[in-house]
Amino acid sequence: MPIQSLAPRRLYRQIADQLRGLIQAGEFAVGTRLPPERDLAQQLGVSRPSVREALIALEVEGLVSVRMGSGLEVIAREPAASAPRVDTAFGPFETLLARQLLEAELAAQAALHGLPDQLQDLQHALALMAADVAAGLAPVRGDRLFHLGVAQAAGHGPLVRTVAALFDERDNALFEQLGQHFETLRSWQLALAEHRAVLAAILAGDAPAARAAMHHHLQQSHDRLAASVAAPGADAALPAAAAAAAAAAAATAAAAAPGSRRRPLRPTPLLHPPT
């Protein structure tokens, strides 16, 4: 069964379906490795981020293992019975693009129309993020409050629900698995700095700067998932205190509420650069 090129429609699901079919047909036997991400993208005629989403979906299903130094190994011929269903209509990269298009303009409007109490809410959300990052936890609670707060400060009530729906796509199994691989202490430190730039522009009433800062932040969020991650050890320059905070957080992981995604963060990515 040869690999076939695909039309650009919900690509990650099409790619996952085709690779799943090849695995089930025995073209890729259990214990063997799939072609590198780069080669799969070339054979399928699609982008590497779309291939990555598909591979993560297959990992969620229990068909493949995506491990540091081990490549993409087939570990089962059929999806695990206990595996969560990956049924999101849109992949993480498509969702991030939609957020970028929407939230950049909302940030500009927030700079022009934000009320004092709304701006205080943004500062509170940022403080929550900073506290979680300092504790070595993924700061999704404060992150969500911040992005919804920007929409509220923009004065567009219906779009608050739209932003919430897009943000909450992060709770699906595909986005969660991507985060397990690529979210690190360093990536959230960078994201925190980007949020601070957005807030500074909003507080200054500088709409163009707020628009640019939010656009930059969501582009960087996309790139941190889509681009090749740094080789192991690239984050070795993290301050010792930050690494210690992550280790301490790991030791007290039970304190994080189940399902909250405030999981302990690693100092470095789980994976080698995708190939």
Question: Model features per residue range: what roles?
Answer:
Residues 44, 154-155, 229:
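A broad structural signal for alpha-helix termini and local helix breaks/kinks
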Residues 99-102, 107-177, 194-200, 209-221:
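Conserved amphipathic alpha-helical segments that form helical-bundle/coiled-coil interaction surfaces
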Residues 27, 63, 137, 206-207:
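Residue-level recognition of short, well-ordered coil/turn positions
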